[in-house]
Amino acid sequence: MPGCCDPIDYRRLFSRKSAARDLRRYREHGLTGTSLELVKLAGDVHGVSVLDVGGGIGAIELALLRAGAARATSVEISDEYEEEAEKLLAEHGYSGCVDRNVGDFVADAGTIEEHDVVVLHRVVCCYPDVDALVGEAAAHARRLLLLTYPQDRWYIRSGVRGINVFLALSRCGFRTYAHPVERILAAAAAHGLTPVARKRHGALWESASLSRAGSR
């Protein structure tokens, strides 16, 4: 579904204010929660290339670079994060180490090269076409795909419906999604990736690592 998402709708929620809040939280606490869990699931990243889709201020990219990744690429649909992302890299001595791009990853997938590791942290729940998003992410992962997505639970689906009613009443075109987990994994499997680990984080999130046969 190329071009299915209006960046204006994303900028309303993922704004400069939210970027500043994320940077402030990182400065105070460092990497926490599901972000930290995903970095742990990455394992040994020495010398690898990383593609982070929807990574916001780039905290996971920074963590993987500090862990030994050779280079990183970011694709973020909201341009409101760019200034704070550059600040974060500069503060830790990594200015110029991340190739940052603004755009819809699915629509722009043909212009983006494959990477060893691809990251989708809390991105699946923000995109309507899960098959296209996860499929392109898997196709771009030479070695490993890391994801965090909502668990398959009834109360999460109910909560998502409530959130979307509120967004509609607020005249915001953005919607959130609770895609079936098996559909997420199937989209990756269609491109040759199989689950290595799946870990639940509290009552909401699940993180997973999926690898390509013979790549590790």
Indicate where each model-derived feature is located.
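A short SAM/SAH-binding and catalytic strip from SAM-dependent methyltransferases
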Residues: V117-D129
